[in-house]
Amino acid sequence: MEKKMLYEGKAKKVYEAEDKDHVIIYYKDDATAFNGAKKSQIDHKGILNNNITSAIFEMLHEKGIETHFEKKLNEREQLCKKVEIVPLEVIVRNVAAGSMAKRLGVSEGKELNTTIFEICYKNDELGDPLINDYHAVALGLATFDELKEIYNITSNVNNILKEFFLKQNIKLIDFKLEFGRFNGKIILADEISPDTCRFWDATTNEKLDKDRFRRDMGNVEEAYIEILNRISNAK
């Protein structure tokens, strides 16, 4: 029987699962940048991101982080808990890069005195604008208690991921997290991949992420394969 699609985003499709508490997430090869202004396809990106995200979520589970991920079903699909997505993106910045470097006039690659957490309102029509906690609560996107829990989880995930990737000679420059509500709890959702993270080789500072697509640097698929190979060797 053909699965019923519940939602299609830029990089993934969400389908009904056999029970109401789960969904099947399908990873596409579509690539977008600049809020959809730039579009293309990257060969095997969906397969690579599914494998990378599955491996990272499994590692986070071992470290006590609860996520929506249940198991990898095949090359492109995961079984995940059906969460109510909190319409926020949490951006963690360990090193100045990307839009923050441009916005604040900071040179890319500058080490920061402290890690920066930013939140954006998930709204494609508005271009996912940067907001603060008071906006989020005033607009009914989250409560202060939920934000506190989101930041606690984010801090723990950042510490785990920085250590994990550095062991693979990868610097975690910045990354985006999304969260969902499930059975009254806030849990980590979405994906963790070169689509949502900036990964630099710790020795050469070579970019191993979607910046290669954004900036027309070439070898995009090869960079994603390199990330998968390094984290696979970590197991």
Swiss-Prot record:
GO MF? ATP binding; phosphoribosylaminoimidazolesuccinocarboxamide synthase activity
Entry's family note: Belongs to the SAICAR synthetase family.
Q: What is this protein called?
A: Phosphoribosylaminoimidazole-succinocarboxamide synthase
Q: What SUPFAM superfamilies does the database record attribute to this sequence?
A: SAICAR synthase-like
Q: Which reaction does it catalyse?
A: 5-amino-1-(5-phospho-D-ribosyl)imidazole-4-carboxylate + L-aspartate + ATP = (2S)-2-[5-amino-1-(5-phospho-beta-D-ribosyl)imidazole-4-carboxamido]succinate + ADP + phosphate + 2 H(+)
- E.C. no: 6.3.2.6
Q: What is a biological process (GO) this protein takes part in?
A: cobalamin biosynthetic process
Q: Which UniProt keywords are listed?
A: ATP-binding, Ligase, Nucleotide-binding, Purine biosynthesis
The pathway is: Purine metabolism; IMP biosynthesis via de novo pathway; 5-amino-1-(5-phospho-D-ribosyl)imidazole-4-carboxamide from 5-amino-1-(5-phospho-D-ribosyl)imidazole-4-carboxylate: step 1/2
Q: Does the keyword Ligase belong to this entry?
A: yes
Q: Which gene encodes it?
A: purC
Keyword match Ligase: yes
Q: Which source organism?
A: Clostridium novyi (strain NT)
